[in-house]
């Protein structure tokens, strides 16, 4: 298994061992953890930052690199589940997240191939077409750009593959996910964050704010950190160190592949079949394709990053629906573990039953739609004691 985005990457900072103290500890060096560490460092708090593997090695470096607005549900469904006003507010948070990420690319000069070409949602069946059209109408009514493409408006490559209707969302974007996260990490360390990669958390004992003990293990030996506050940004793995999340965030595996570079074909990231199928063509010309876990959902649960032969084969069959891709060599295959919350929304803020510990997890396959802002919100919670974002996605909604 060879994740395309992670080629040649490894830990660049020493593992932690021995006894340490810290005012604030951040656990996890994906997008959310990098954002939190950066914001805390810029606030002058110099957080101690721990990562089991290396920066971006988890889902943040194994996804398709989409920067999308909204949740995993189409907007019309989101309205049906959470109500019009809350759906509008949540969608607005994801738009703000994208704008903040774009600002970070510019501010820190991150070379990550960021582009804002929009995204395209395609329908695979008549009922999905109706849902797409309804979502486009509701988005427009609520002030979000959405353009219906059908007939000649839909590019020929999609019509030739059997698609008839799509909705283009012009405010969405794309990037090289690992490069973006590592660019944030570099900025965080330069601002004062103290990063230790290759450092696994073996225990977290929260006696109260100001009295949290973290025990670690690494190639350098065991370690103990006594912290005043801890920010957990481990998404799918949160339940391993915080029992509160064991029945609230499920680890769900996603299959991915990439081809050798081919001639330009797709103009923006694409979602189809209610988001179960997704692909894009990156700046190097490679087709990066993922999804199809609905073919065998029971087996795609868990944290083992393994390939599913049947799903991988189905992904190749799908590629061959596009004549220009029938001879494209597959150069990379990999999987990654996402954290799906029980209600499809991020879970942020103080962790019930763990005083002194806060978390931002459960991004449900849309980490690049929410996690950057979530990390900033966690830092705001530490520094100022409150955050509107945290209020919107508080873990308290499960503590009833």
Predicted regions and their residues:
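Active-site lid/adjacent beta-loop-alpha segment flanking the redox-cofactor pocket in flavoenzymes
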Residues: 263-356
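Glycine-rich FAD pyrophosphate-binding loop
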Residues: 42-62
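Helical element adjacent to the flavin cofactor pocket in flavoenzyme catalytic cores
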Residues: 130, 137-138, 166-227
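Extreme N-terminal leader/targeting segments of oxidoreductases
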Residues: 1-24
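C-terminal catalytic lobe of FAD-dependent flavoproteins
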Residues: 171, 304, 320-400
């Amino acid at each position: 298994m060879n994740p395309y985005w992670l080629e040649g990457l490894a830990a660049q900072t020493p593992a932690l061992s021995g006894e340490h103290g810290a005012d604030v500890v951040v656990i996890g060096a994906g997008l959310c953890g990098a954002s939190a560490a950066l914001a805390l460092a810029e606030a002058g708090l110099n957080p101690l930052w721990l990562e089991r593997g290396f920066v971006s090695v988890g889902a943040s470096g194994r996804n398709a690199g989409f920067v999308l607005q909204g949740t995993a549900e189409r907007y019309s469904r989101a309205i049906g589940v959470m109500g019009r006003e809350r759906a509008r507010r949540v969608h607005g948070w994801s738009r703000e997240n994208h704008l903040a990420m774009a600002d970070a690319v510019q501010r820190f000069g991150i070379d990550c191939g960021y582009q804002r070409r929009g995204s395209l949602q395609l329908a695979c069946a008549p009922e999905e077409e109706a849902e797409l059209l309804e979502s486009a109408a509701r988005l427009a009514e609520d002030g979000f750009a959405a353009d219906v493409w059908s007939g000649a408006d839909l590019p020929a490559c999609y019509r030739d593959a059997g698609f008839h209707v799509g909705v283009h969302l012009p405010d969405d974007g794309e990037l090289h996910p690992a490069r973006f996260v590592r660019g944030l990490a570099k900025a965080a360390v330069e601002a004062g964050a103290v990063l230790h990669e290759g450092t696994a958390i073996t225990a977290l004992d929260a006696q109260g704010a100001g009295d949290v003990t973290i025990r670690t293990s690494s190639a350098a030996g065991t370690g103990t950190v006594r912290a005043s506050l801890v920010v957990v940004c481990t998404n799918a793995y949160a339940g391993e160190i915080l029992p509160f999340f064991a029945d609230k965030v499920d680890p769900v595996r996603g299959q991915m592949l990439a081809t050798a570079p081919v001639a330009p074909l797709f103009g923006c990231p694409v979602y189809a079949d209610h988001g179960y199928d997704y692909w894009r063509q990156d700046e190097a010309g490679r087709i990066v394709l993922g999804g199809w876990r609905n073919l065998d959902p029971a087996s795609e649960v868990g944290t083992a990053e393994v390939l599913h032969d049947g799903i991988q084969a189905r992904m190749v069959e799908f590629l061959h629906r596009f004549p220009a891709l029938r001879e494209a060599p597959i150069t990379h295959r990999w999987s990654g573990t996402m954290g799906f919350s029980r209600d499809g929304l991020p879970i942020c803020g103080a962790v019930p039953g763990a005083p002194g510990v806060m978390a931002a997890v459960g991004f449900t396959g849309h980490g690049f739609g929410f996690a950057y802002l979530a990390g900033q919100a966690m830092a705001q919670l530490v520094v100022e004691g409150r955050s509107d974002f945290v209020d919107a996605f508080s873990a308290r909604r499960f503590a009833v």
